[in-house]
Structure formats: structure tokens, C-alpha cells
């Protein structure tokens, strides 16, 4: 491919794939080494976002990002973060995570204002061991609330199974355009709203379907109470998540969102849905207890999920390779500010 491009544009000698790969890794390593110095020299108020990857080969990748302690006024973007930790082990115990975080803190010279992560026991315990304030990621936490409410619910699981069977039965037919989206096996409660949205739209348009289509999806109206219940949870979840992701959590916003939940999402006739809403209400209260007046903290770790997504897309499809030095492309792929000048 590179030879074809070179011939088309009159380039006498085109760099090889290996050369490009070496450049990317060299630039990534240089930026990785400088990230901690830049934070230290600029006296940046920073916080950590920490997460570990799924098993790659026989290894797990621990990724540590430094983000602005104060929400920048929008959902975190790649240019807002610095990769300050890339570590690989077979597994990550809390003590190991704490040791790596402490190494980063020692090099920077002062502590982060807080640590943001999912509810993984090892990550939470590592933060506690270092006596650092810990924020629970809003998306993962909401997913846990839904899992607690619905994971063992008979009708919920029946409806999921009927959707799965419909996909298998009609995916190569003229009804395929009406099928629900795929259900994810992992983090399924964090991603169930795609099919909830599908179910709501099918309910609203059910009477407009022809007889064959109605027969294929006759099970959907039978679960309309469950669907509308999940739709209400989705409405609250979406509103709270978008507010917190884009504005950050402040004491003012916490009060605004808790008032919103009480006014709009407390259902005396539905104890399960009310229970979910009260868990969200209490979650906001707990996270706001870590704030001082005037502070606005980031509560969404979607940015680290995005970076892991890039890594999974670019890494070798051969699972036996594990994590290779090409992981350094993560730092060079970020849109770094001009103040970060790599020294080769």
C-alpha cells in the first residue's frame, strides 16, 4: 500500500511500516516520560483516572490518566488528559495498584486531589490504602443499581431471552430491520438502554405493523409494564449522566439533581423503580460529600474507556501476543497541548 502511494505521488522512497511503528513508539515513550514532569512544573491541580483492561493473552494492562481536578466545563476529551501510567502484570492486587500510584505521585511531587475509577474492589482498596479521596464512576455505579434490581428478575430475563430468539429467527428475513440490537455479554447493565429504546419505539409503532410483523413481535406488548419502567429509569439516568459528564459534580448541581429526582422520578406505586431512584439520590449525596464549596469534580471515567477502545482496535488480533511495546502509541495518539514537547 505504501509503495502504491509513493508511486502515485512521486515519492522516491517510502518509509516502511516498521519505521512508522518505531516512530510512533518512540514519540509515545517520550511523551509518556514527560507527562509527569509537565504536571510537576506547571503545578497543575490534577486527579487520577484508573482502570485495568480485560485479560490480553495472560496479561492485564493497568492504565493511569492524569486529568484536571476541576471539570473543564465539558465531558473529558483526549486533549484534557495525560497518560502517566502504563503497567502490565498477570493480575492487579490492591497492593500492586497502590504501589504503582505511589510511584507516580512521588515523581510528580504532590498528591492528586482525588481518584476516579469504577467499583472494582482492587482499585477502591488501593485508593483507600493511599488515603486518597475516591469518586465512583457514575456510569458503572448506575449499572450496578440496575443489576441489583433486575439481574434475578424473572420477567426481565424472559424478555431478554425472547429478544435473543427473535434475532436468531428473523435475522435473514424481511423482518430483520425490526430486530432489537445485540445484547452485550459484558457490562450488560451499563448498555441495556439500546434495547430499551428499541422496545419503546416498537411499542409506539406496533399498531402500524402488518400482521406478520405483529406476530413476530407479539411478545413485546406483553411486557409493556416492564418496558415503560425501564424507560423511566433510562430517562432519569440520561438526564443525570449528561449533566454530570458535561458540568462536573458540584454542591449546587448535586442539589439540583436530587430535587429533580424527587420531583420527577419517585413512584409510590412502584417500589423497585423508586428504590433505584433513591440509590441514585444517595449516590449523588455521597459523592458531593467529598466536595468543598466552589469545587466541581469529574465523575465520569468514559475517557479511559475510550482509550481502552482505541487500544483494543489497534492491538494485534493474535491473543497470544499479550501487551506489546506498541501500547506506547496510546500516548502519542492523544491530542497533546503545545506545552508538551517530547525530547528524543
State each model region's role:
Residues 1-11:
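DNA-recognition alpha helix
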Residues 9, 82-87, 289-293, 312:
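Glycine- and acidic
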Residues 11-115, 125-140, 148-152, 169, ...:
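RNase H-like nuclease fold core
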Residues 110, 117-129, 142, 166-344:
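Acidic/histidine-rich catalytic cores and adjacent linkers
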Residues 145:
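Conserved His + Asp/Glu catalytic blocks
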Residues 153-170:
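A polyampholytic, Gly/Pro-enriched intrinsically disordered region
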Amino acid at each position: 500500500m505504501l509503495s502504491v502511494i509513493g508511486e502515485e505521488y512521486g515519492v522516491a522512497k517510502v518509509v516502511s511500516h516498521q519505521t512508522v511503528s518505531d516512530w510512533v513508539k518512540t514519540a509515545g515513550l517520550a511523551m509518556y516520560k514527560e507527562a509527569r514532569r509537565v504536571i510537576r512544573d506547571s503545578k497543575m491541580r490534577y486527579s487520577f483516572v484508573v482502570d485495568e483492561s480485560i485479560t490480553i493473552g495472560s496479561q492485564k494492562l493497568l492504565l493511569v490518566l492524569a486529568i484536571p481536578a476541576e471539570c473543564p466545563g465539558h465531558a473529558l476529551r483526549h486533549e484534557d488528559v495525560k497518560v502517566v501510567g502504563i503497567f502490565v502484570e498477570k493480575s492487579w492486587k490492591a497492593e500492586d495498584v497502590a504501589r504503582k500510584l505511589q510511584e507516580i505521585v512521588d515523581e510528580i511531587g504532590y498528591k492528586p486531589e482525588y481518584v476516579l475509577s469504577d467499583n472494582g474492589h482492587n482499585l477502591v482498596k488501593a485508593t483507600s490504602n493511599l488515603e486518597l479521596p475516591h469518586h465512583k464512576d457514575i456510569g458503572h455505579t448506575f449499572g450496578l443499581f440496575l443489576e441489583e434490581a433486575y439481574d434475578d428478575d424473572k420477567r426481565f430475563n424472559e424478555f431478554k431471552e425472547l429478544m435473543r430468539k427473535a434475532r436468531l429467527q428473523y435475522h435473514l428475513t424481511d423482518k430483520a430491520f425490526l430486530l432489537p440490537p445485540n445484547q452485550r455479554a459484558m457490562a450488560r447493565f451499563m448498555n441495556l438502554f439500546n434495547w430499551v429504546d428499541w422496545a419503546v419505539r416498537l411499542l409506539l409503532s406496533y399498531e402500524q405493523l402488518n400482521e406478520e410483523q405483529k406476530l413476530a413481535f407479539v411478545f413485546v406488548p406483553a411486557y409493556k409494564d416492564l418496558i415503560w419502567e425501564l424507560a423511566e429509569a433510562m430517562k432519569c439516568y440520561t438526564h443525570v449522566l449528561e449533566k454530570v459528564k458535561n458540568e462536573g459534580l458540584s454542591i449546587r448541581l448535586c442539589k439540583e439533581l436530587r430535587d429533580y429526582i424527587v420531583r420527577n422520578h419517585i413512584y409510590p406505586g412502584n417500589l423497585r423503580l423508586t428504590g433505584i431512584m433513591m440509590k441514585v439520590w444517595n449516590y449523588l449525596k455521597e459523592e458531593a460529600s467529598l466536595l468543598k464549596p466552589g469545587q466541581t469534580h469529574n465523575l465520569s471515567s468514559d475517557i479511559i474507556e475510550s482509550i481502552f477502545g482505541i487500544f483494543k482496535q489497534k492491538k494485534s488480533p493474535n491473543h497470544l501476543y499479550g501487551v506489546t511495546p506498541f501500547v506506547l502509541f496510546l500516548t502519542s495518539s492523544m491530542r497533546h497541548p503545545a506545552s508538551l514537547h517530547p525530547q528524543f
